[in-house]
From Swiss-Prot:
Record lineage: Bacteria, Bacillati, Actinomycetota, Actinomycetes, Mycobacteriales
Function: Specifically dimethylates two adjacent adenosines (A1518 and A1519) in the loop of a conserved hairpin near the 3'-end of 16S rRNA in the 30S particle. May play a critical role in biogenesis of 30S subunits.
Pfam families xref list: RrnaAD
Record's protein name: Ribosomal RNA small subunit methyltransferase A
EC number(s) from the headed UniProt entry: 2.1.1.182
Native source organism of the sequence: Mycobacterium leprae (strain TN)
CDD domains (alphabetical): AdoMet_MTases (cd02440)
Length: 306
């Protein structure tokens, strides 16, 4: 039987009652300190996978697989999955769950019992092409930014996060939700919201709605993507939003060395010094850095191509 997502139904997905059995078997309780809210609704995980558009050519990175609801749906599409799980009990049980729910899909799964923020490129033998996850609430933004920076091979991201986090990630300059996460995520690619997710599809039921967010990395980045350049841009973003109600001229005084130099650098980047940091786009921050360190557009394009 074929589904609209292009996946073939060969794996039995987890249901709520099975998750309750697993809780009893493992004698575990969701830990708020780890942001654990487990998705148990099959239609929701199918929706996430459909939004991600992953297929058998993809190597997917999943963060916080929990009991394996989303993991099974990803394997059902034919993708290979590397699941990063900080909870040793859940990490140890996941391969058995996959084996119990499928015929021969376990060979496409690897499980890493690690903190996602310490996960590095060298920890994987194969470069991931996609990130698909129900991100733990407590590390959603840092995990997302860390993995995009650490794994440039990731071309698409599809994640469930708290609704208010989803709004911040996809916010436009000048909006009430626009902030550091919005700007930094847009450094890597185009961000869009893909709908809301009801609290009732999780156990335990959270007090807030979740949102589905998709990121498509730029096919050709408009700016350099090396670590040094990214850190410099992000430094400017942090400065601007630490003092978001100040004019850009005043916010960047310490960075530029003086008020006059701050204004000169902003004007050189075609930015009105009276604008507030909360109105600046990622393009503005990149242009400000380029003009300030003496890079011209030709040099930047050359660096991007190398």
């Amino acid at each position: 039987m074929q589904r609209k997502s292009g996946c073939t139904l060969t794996i039995r997905l987890l249901e709520r009652t099975e998750i309750r059995w697993l809780v009893k078997e493992l004698e575990c309780r969701p830990r708020k300190s780890l942001g654990q809210n487990f998705v148990h609704d099959a239609n929701t995980v199918r929706r996430v996978v459909s939004t991600s558009r992953v297929n058998r050519s993809d190597f997917v990175l999943e963060v916080g697989p929990g009991f394996g609801s989303l993991t099974l749906a990803l394997l059902d599409c034919g993708a290979a999955v590397s699941a990063i799980e900080i909870d040793p009990v859940l990490a140890g049980r996941l391969p058995q769950t996959v084996a119990e729910h499928s015929n021969n899909e376990i060979h496409r799964l690897t499980v890493c019992n690690r903190d996602v923020l310490s996960f590095r490129r060298g920890d994987l033998a194969t470069e991931p092409t996609a990130l698909v996850a129900n991100l733990p609430y407590n590390v959603a933004v840092p995990a997302l930014l860390h993995l995009l920076a650490e794994f440039p091979s990731i071309r698409t991201v599809t994640v469930m996060v708290q609704a208010e986090v989803a709004e911040r990630l996809a916010a436009e300059p000048g909006g009430k939700d626009y902030g550091v996460p919005s700007v930094k995520l847009s450094f890597f690619g185009r961000v869009r919201r893909c709908g809301m997710v009801s609290p009732t599809v999780f156990w335990p039921i959270p007090r807030v709605y979740s949102g589905l967010v998709r990121v498509d990395r730029y096919a050709t980045s408009p700016w350099p993507t090396d670590d040094a350049f990214r850190r410099q841009v992000f430094e400017l973003v942090d400065i601007a939003f630490t003092q978001r109600r100040k004019t850009s001229r005043n916010a960047f005084v310490k960075w530029a060395g003086s008020s006059n130099e701050s204004a000169n650098r902003l004007l050189a980047a075609s930015i009105d010094p009276a604008r507030r940091g909360e109105t600046l786009s990622i393009d503005d921050f990149v242009r400000l850095l380029r003009r300030s360190d003496g890079r011209d557009d030709a040099a930047v394009r050359s660096a991007s191509a190398s």
